[in-house]
Every structure is written in structure tokens, then in C-alpha cells.
Amino acid sequence: MPKAKTHSGASKRFRRTGTGKIVRQKANRRHLLEHKPTKRTRRLDGRTTVSAADNSRINKLLNG
């Protein structure tokens, strides 16, 4: 049986930390920012961890 491949789209969107958590970028901060409040764009800045409900699914995509 051939080796399972890592999902290339998931590998671009998710990163694993040293402790094993999976982090992602927040959505809604790519374009059309001029009508979004500055408070909202600041809140959407940075990374956040993946929710526990999605953790196992993303693990399968990343591990192949």
C-alpha cells in the first residue's frame, strides 16, 4: 500500500507548535478592510489554536 500523503492545502494553513497544538490564522483579514472597524482588525490579528472539535480531523490531514 502506498504512503499516505499530507494534505497540501492543510499544510499551508496550519502549523504545529512545539507542544503539539495546531495553530491557524484568523479569517476575515485579507481584503475589504476599509469598512471593518479597527477594533475588529486588531482582534483578528495574530494566530489562534484550532478548536478541540476540529483537532483530530486536521491531525489526519497533516499526518497523511
UniProtKB/Swiss-Prot annotation:
Belongs to the bacterial ribosomal protein bL35 family. This is Large ribosomal subunit protein bL35. Residues 1-64 are annotated as: Disordered. InterPro entries: Ribosomal_bL35, Ribosomal_bL35-like, Ribosomal_bL35_CS, Ribosomal_bL35_sf. GO terms for biological process: translation. Residues 48-58 have a biased composition (Polar residues). Residues 1-42 have a biased composition (Basic residues).
